[in-house]
């Protein structure tokens, strides 16, 4: 064999092993949530009080609904289309919102709608982030009730031990054990498929459910509960949004390949196997997943299920951290301390406030609902709400960004909207039955995010009212030049045409200016990352005054000193011991001025007081920072 052929073969093998590695990684991170849905979906359908009979027509009808829901919602909508709506490789409701906002830029009202829709989607995701760990781990531990009599009272304590332990280790990171997530989940899906084949062999007639006629016939024979049952079958779709949210880690192709080659076949086989078990014994509907397993495999499946649900919960928690970082960068959430838990993976982060809030919510859910069957009632609202928001934002992308022809875009969008609206409507009655929790959590988080965003806008407007134009200030410095001291002073400001308040206060009290005065503005872009050649803009005004604008993406850490060192301008010296950073810290005073309701102004003042300041957020050196305070009425 020639050297060229050998190198080509090695390259091919390298690409092949890399592709397989990405697929395995995607299975471990992206598919944990939807992969653990078989633990509770069919159980909820048949014992959740919907009135579905565990007979031949009922089982085949439900299986057909689940199968075609997986095909349309996950395979067609998410894997084939939504994954293509990446924001420079990043996905998720925040990234999609930023993408749609750029596309809707010429239309003010549409842009406002996109912002509000993105905030609602993000708020519902946080509610989902609490429910997923609770219902997944509870459903896994409940398998012990099948294996051993009298363990019902131990289900909740065991689930709490697992969940609290999971949240406690977040601060230390999961880099070391994270490499096992993919192989464990591959083993999990292999077990799902094997159990499914075991069940289908006993009742091959369940394969008839692939015919959509059974789903249509089910609606026809159950006119009273046909739509309501969608509220239970949607549990099979939980985690579909995670495929899109985690796209930045693996890319579209590995996620799509993992779905079609492993995850979808394993899920379909397992659901059909559970259906076969119910056809053989209607009593198996009380927990068809575990009763599908042979007796000798029950305890191993409980152990594997617990591992799989922990991995699924970890993926959701990590997703909440990532979403929070994006929201902070886009200006929707107060600044928090972000801790990196891995020196190799930039995306592995820890946000203490989010972690403890999620833990409290999860513990309250487990204590309040006590079983996966009870908790299933609260699950669908957040899931279908987020799916509906994604469809609405996708409509903007299809129209304004992809510019599909109307004859193609309108029918496709209408079908997506109709399906998601049907699922969402089917879950609305759950608000009364226990589904109020994610709705309340979503409302609270939406109020917090919208109040912070609006409060920041009002704060900038109030500061602008008393601002001095930069050109006037520089002209006055030429007429009456103050004493200049050595070094570089960097003043952070949101305005590019006005004098920062910190500069005016410093000049008023100290009567001096540095040799070099830099007015620095940080701009957070709607894209995930900014290339080095677009990182900064520099403008020299003369007399030692400079304007610098730094650009950061919503997936980047805004390190100002590191960015300024790349500012190649001979006149500027940003050496650490010659540079002083001046910050302005505002204290907000609620007033009767037109802006927000007084209670929202008070809430914003509280959030601003407890938010991390610019010092930590921008990685400024502690011994080179001077903060100057000012009071502002909003």
Swiss-Prot record:
<feature type="transmembrane region" description="Helical">
    <location>
        <begin position="379"/>
        <end position="399"/>
    </location>
</feature>
<feature type="transmembrane region" description="Helical">
    <location>
        <begin position="150"/>
        <end position="170"/>
    </location>
</feature>
<dbReference type="InterPro" id="IPR023051">
    <property type="entry name" value="Kup"/>
</dbReference>
<dbReference type="Pfam" id="PF22776">
    <property type="entry name" value="K_trans_C"/>
</dbReference>
<dbReference type="InterPro" id="IPR053951">
    <property type="entry name" value="K_trans_N"/>
</dbReference>
<keyword id="KW-0633">Potassium transport</keyword>
<dbReference type="GO" id="GO:0005886">
    <property type="term" value="C:plasma membrane"/>
</dbReference>
<protein>
    <recommendedName>
        <fullName>Probable potassium transport system protein Kup</fullName>
    </recommendedName>
</protein>
<keyword id="KW-0812">Transmembrane</keyword>
<feature type="transmembrane region" description="Helical">
    <location>
        <begin position="291"/>
        <end position="311"/>
    </location>
</feature>
<feature type="transmembrane region" description="Helical">
    <location>
        <begin position="113"/>
        <end position="133"/>
    </location>
</feature>
<feature type="transmembrane region" description="Helical">
    <location>
        <begin position="406"/>
        <end position="426"/>
    </location>
</feature>
<dbReference type="InterPro" id="IPR053952">
    <property type="entry name" value="K_trans_C"/>
</dbReference>
<feature type="transmembrane region" description="Helical">
    <location>
        <begin position="19"/>
        <end position="39"/>
    </location>
</feature>
<comment type="function">
    <text>Transport of potassium into the cell. Likely operates as a K(+):H(+) symporter.</text>
</comment>
<dbReference type="InterPro" id="IPR003855">
    <property type="entry name" value="K+_transporter"/>
</dbReference>
<keyword id="KW-0406">Ion transport</keyword>
<comment type="similarity">
    <text>Belongs to the HAK/KUP transporter (TC 2.A.72) family.</text>
</comment>
<keyword id="KW-0813">Transport</keyword>
<feature type="transmembrane region" description="Helical">
    <location>
        <begin position="259"/>
        <end position="279"/>
    </location>
</feature>
<dbReference type="GO" id="GO:0015293">
    <property type="term" value="F:symporter activity"/>
</dbReference>
<dbReference type="Pfam" id="PF02705">
    <property type="entry name" value="K_trans"/>
</dbReference>
<keyword id="KW-1133">Transmembrane helix</keyword>
<keyword id="KW-0630">Potassium</keyword>
<feature type="transmembrane region" description="Helical">
    <location>
        <begin position="431"/>
        <end position="451"/>
    </location>
</feature>
<keyword id="KW-1003">Cell membrane</keyword>
<keyword id="KW-0472">Membrane</keyword>
<keyword id="KW-0769">Symport</keyword>
<feature type="transmembrane region" description="Helical">
    <location>
        <begin position="177"/>
        <end position="197"/>
    </location>
</feature>
<dbReference type="GO" id="GO:0015079">
    <property type="term" value="F:potassium ion transmembrane transporter activity"/>
</dbReference>
<feature type="transmembrane region" description="Helical">
    <location>
        <begin position="349"/>
        <end position="369"/>
    </location>
</feature>
<keyword id="KW-0997">Cell inner membrane</keyword>
<feature type="transmembrane region" description="Helical">
    <location>
        <begin position="225"/>
        <end position="245"/>
    </location>
</feature>
<feature type="transmembrane region" description="Helical">
    <location>
        <begin position="62"/>
        <end position="82"/>
    </location>
</feature>
